[in-house]
């Protein structure tokens, strides 16, 4: 038997999950007072990229080959986002004396440096990215974002790798 879902429905489900994840991130920021660090913002961009690709894939409603292309793009975006999440988890695991100093905000960096230099500085991390603001079931937000990206990757690979029903 199996799950009878079309590629379009599967892509729409990913887009909806991404919208929900961004909605929760905004809730955490504006209602719970958890200010996002530069790595958090990059993770949000990753979620939005996956969501936008999923929505475009659903609107395009491609055949088997096209679905694999869209799925590959979504997987690459999710892998990038997961990499940022794992980087932040690593920073959060450092002993206090090894945490990098806090740096300038992302807005200042974007105004002052070229994009590649901004990405390099942000990915090196800073003190605010190592700070743990809150936990859910004992785990930090970057952990749950990494789990989200892993789920998207597994779902997408399953969706485009199965025998297509519609």
UniProtKB/Swiss-Prot annotation:
Pfam families reported for this sequence: DsbB (PF02600)
Keyword Protein biosynthesis found: no
Keywords linked to the UniProt accession: Cell inner membrane, Cell membrane, Chaperone, Disulfide bond, Electron transport, Membrane, Oxidoreductase, Redox-active center, Transmembrane, Transmembrane helix, Transport
Compartments reported by the entry: Cell inner membrane
GO MF annotations in UniProt: electron transfer activity; protein-disulfide reductase activity
Membrane topology: Multi-pass membrane protein
A single Gene Ontology CC term: plasma membrane
Disulfide bonding pattern of the chain: 37-40, 102-129
Coiled-coil regions, chain positions: none
Residues in the Cytoplasmic compartment per record: 1-10, 63-69, 163-166
Transmembrane segments annotated in the record for this chain: 11-27, 46-62, 70-86, 144-162
Domain of life according to the entry: Bacteria
GO biological process: protein folding
Periplasmic side: 28-45, 87-143
Family according to the record: Belongs to the DsbB family.
Biological role stated in the UniProt entry: Required for disulfide bond formation in some periplasmic proteins. Acts by oxidizing the DsbA protein.
Name under which the protein is recorded: Disulfide bond formation protein B
Organism: Chromobacterium violaceum (strain ATCC 12472 / DSM 30191 / JCM 1249 / CCUG 213 / NBRC 12614 / NCIMB 9131 / NCTC 9757 / MK)
């Amino acid at each position: 038997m199996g799950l009878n879902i079309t590629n379009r429905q599967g892509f729409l489900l990913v887009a909806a999950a991404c919208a929900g994840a961004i909605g929760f991130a905004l809730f955490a920021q504006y209602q719970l007072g958890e200010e996002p660090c530069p790595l958090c913002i990059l993770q949000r961009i990753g979620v939005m990229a996956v969501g936008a690709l999923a929505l475009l894939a659903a609107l395009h409603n491609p055949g088997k080959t096209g679905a694999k292309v869209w799925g590959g793009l979504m997987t690459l975006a999710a892998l990038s986002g997961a990499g940022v999440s794992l980087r932040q988890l690593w920073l959060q695991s450092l002993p206090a004396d090894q945490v990098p100093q806090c740096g300038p905000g992302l807005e200042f960096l974007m105004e002052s440096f070229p994009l590649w230099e901004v990405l390099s500085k942000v990915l090196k991390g800073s003190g605010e990215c190592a700070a743990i603001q809150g936990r859910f079931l004992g785990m930090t937000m970057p952990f749950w974002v990494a789990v989200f990206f892993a789920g998207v990757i597994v779902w997408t690979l399953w969706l485009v790798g199965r025998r297509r029903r519609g």
